[in-house]
Structures are given as C-alpha cells and as structure tokens.
Amino acid sequence: YLPGIPDGYAMIGAYAQGNYDKPSDCILAVKPANEQSISLLQIPGNWNRVWTDKGSGASMDGSIWHPTPQSNNYVCLGSIAKKGYKQPNLSNYVCVHRCLVESIPVNYPVWSTKGTGSKQKTNVYKLHNSNSFFAVPGKNSPASLTDIKGNMSCSF
C-alpha cells in the first residue's frame, strides 16, 4: 500500500499487512528540518524487482520492488508493492544516511508467497520502527534487517 505523503515529505517505505482489509496503520514520512539535514536523505539510484505474481493466476498483475542507494553511505529501508511489472517512478521515496539506521531482529513474515502459485518465493517482513516492510526473495528468513533507529540523532 502506498499512502499519500504530505507535500515536502518523503517516504522511506510502503505499508504491508497480511490480509486484504483496509490499511489499518501508517508509515513514517520524513522531511529535512534544515539545510544541513538535507544530506541525511537521498533519492534511490535504481530499483530492483524482488517479486512478481507471475504464475499465481491472480486477476491483477503485481510486483514488489526494493530501491538501491546511489552511495554506500545510504540505506534504502522499505520495499514497495505496485500494480503491474514496470519499475516504480517515485519522486517522494528516499534512502537515509547510514548513521540513522540499526539492525533489528526478524519476526515472522506478515505475508509470504506460500500457496499463491507464484513462480518466485518471497517473504515480507514488517520494519517496526518505520512501519514499512522489506521483501526478501527465497524461502529462508534473514537473521536481521535494517530499520530506522529509535533514536534519530546522528553526527558525521
């Protein structure tokens, strides 16, 4: 789910839940507080397709994508899901400076492709600090994921 973002703000990931009900939560939107903090955010360099519903027999085509940062100093946190198979074109998505993230433990997936008939296996995990999600291809769970820090202070 891609929620609306207020003008001047950007998202660091989209929202996912394990059912088809109306979205019941929100995501974290970010905005530079001043000129110095602009360097903490960066638009993605590219998008990598993580999953498509090809082979599932679903009535609507869908895909999940994860951005890649332009620089190793930045981390792109959340994945996005969208209709169709074309690469996203999101001007309001940003990656964050590495000093703003931390490793978090992995809980159970909020969604997986198990039973969908999809040719690609993927698990979707919730990032609790940013309230976004991260899609991981394959059947195995990662040991940890990266999310925004609970304490957002940073010096560099």
Where are each of the predicted segments found?
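Peripheral, non-catalytic segments of secretory and membrane proteins
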Residues: Y1-F156
